[in-house]
A protein has these predicted regions:
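Low-complexity or membrane-interfacial segments used for flexible interactions
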Residues: 1-33, 38-40, 71-74, 79-164
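Acidic (E/D-rich), amphipathic helical modules within compact regulatory domains
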Residues: 24, 32-67
Length: 164
């Protein structure tokens, strides 16, 4: 499983077993909005405020979750899955030279680990996805990857701007 960057503004393709599952697209160059289609439903991630500290997750015009960034860069992803159950995940950024982005659930169990695939010779924004089988088989897993990919690209953009 991996996330392949298609542009520098944050667009990416999510592949699972060498098959394209979905593509996340930013409609305008400096737009903080992101749009994708998953399970024949339109999913939009859009900023709630000017500062970019809260993003809304909107499915088919109905608010279904949020991505919250506090002043210490603690990031929480909250969304309602297909079974109408609230899912909450927290980001932990590990490493300095070799970064890893770990997303854990409320119980503290690591669900997804995203690792950048770049080296000092070749700079890319692609990410490898690692997860245990009991989580990768969950119905909400692919949807969670959308939000995790968006968050990691957001962090990389903050770091590039010197905000972090």
């Amino acid at each position: 499983m991996k996330i392949i960057s298609t542009s520098s503004r944050g667009n990416f393709i999510y592949e699972r077993d060498e098959k394209k599952i979905l593509e996340l697209v930013h409609p305008k160059w400096f737009s903080k909005k992101a749009i994708t289609k998953y399970n024949n439903k339109n999913i939009k991630i859009e900023p709630k405020n000017y500062w970019g500290s809260k993003y809304l997750i909107v499915k088919e015009g109905i608010e279904k979750g949020s991505i919250d960034v506090d002043w210490k860069n603690n990031i929480t992803i909250t969304f309602i899955d297909q079974n109408e159950v609230a899912q909450i995940f927290k980001l932990t950024n590990k490493g300095f030279w070799k970064q890893q982005f770990e997303f854990s659930n409320i119980e503290g169990e690591i669900v997804i680990v995203l690792t950048p695939l770049n080296t000092w010779k070749k700079w890319t924004n692609d990410l490898a996805i690692e997860s245990s089988l009991n989580y990768s088989n969950q119905k909400y897993f692919d949807e969670l990857v959308i939000y995790c990919g968006f968050v990691v690209r957001l962090i990389q953009q903050y770091a590039g701007a010197g905000v972090v």
